[in-house]
């Protein structure tokens, strides 16, 4: 076989002219070499948030954004992040934003995301007004791969979400390695609930309510069961500044993607949040060359939060009043306990009693858990006056006035009268004086009235009939009639029709036949 070589010097092909046209295309140019893996991991994290990625070019660098009704995420790459950056060919006064499909972006960085060593660098040529974006991947052995990704149309102008980190009153900073094992176990759920107090964070998820309908919605809502609950103490948190204890729910899928990205870099995760209904802002701020920010919508119970913020001032004012009342009440209780100690007799029993009373009083002064989650304690004014009452249990000696005098009851001993029989009269003489005669009493038969005794057996029979089990009736068959006739013949009770015993076993005659029929045969 002979190889055929063609010379394109005189007649250049259309492919070469297209390459020259793309090389001469206008737009911003970005070259990444050392931070190529970070760029590919950012695309992998954004792929779990939205189906499209918005690419914005400005003097501040390159921005990757995803927008949705409930979430907003942005990756900001400064000019120092790239090995080379040229933004002089774009219109700086206009908004330079283009939209790229997430499937196309994943396809471009497919090999880089898996950590292949063949990729050396990447070059972007982005013109927001053009129809395509050129990506040139530099590989080992002087191999270059050029990709022309088609851009999508911008349906509407992008409105910047209105939120601010400085407006959030609660801040928590924690390493991603601490959060990742907790959220990996809950990744099968749609949302999780986070409760924040001064002691730390409590993250929990609940069993799914698949069988909830409009008929059993109220029952299932009250029967919400906790599936997993994890508490992170303040010792494991880098920074934990809480002004208002809150509890809210948020989506776990987007939050987990940012936490996974931070864990790959070994950096911290900063969380800015406020009342339920305001966004939860998750950011990574440890690296000077790039910044990541995710704003998630939060949701709380309908009974505990007012989105206008009117309830916040009331709860804060009540909380301050409760603290003042609790301090005043604790000081008064201490004075009472001191008075009890001084009034005691000084024995060991009284000291132990006073100590137990002071402990009981402090436990009573502590308020019960509140229904409102923003206020951890019930106001002291709502407690009953019996909770403030102090009772002293001391053993007192009985007063002489109250002593009961035990008096012995006296019984009058009546004299026993004894009569002595005179010796003059003996028993024999007394028997002779008394004559005993037996007088027979005749009872005439006429005067005898016969008494008839009737046994009341009817109610017993009725009871027996009630509880009597009916026996099943048996159907009469031809064999029963035949056996009855045979029984009558043997007993001699059958006079009309007589039968011979041999007829029972005579097959020629067939069934049983009377004597008259047998003689005729």
UniProtKB/Swiss-Prot annotation:
Gene3D superfamilies tied to this protein: 3.70.10.10
Domain of life of the native organism: Eukaryota
A GO cellular component annotation in the UniProt record: checkpoint clamp complex
Protein name: Cell cycle checkpoint protein hpr-9
Family membership noted in the UniProt record: Belongs to the rad9 family.
Region (Disordered): 1-20, 318-375, 492-521
SUPFAM superfamilies: DNA clamp
InterPro entries reported for this sequence: DNA_clamp_sf, Rad9/Ddc1
Gene Ontology biological process terms, A to Z: cellular response to ionizing radiation; DNA damage checkpoint signaling; DNA repair; DNA replication checkpoint signaling; mitotic intra-S DNA damage checkpoint signaling
Function: May be a component of the 9-1-1 cell-cycle checkpoint response complex that plays a major role in DNA repair.
Pfam name, any one: Rad9
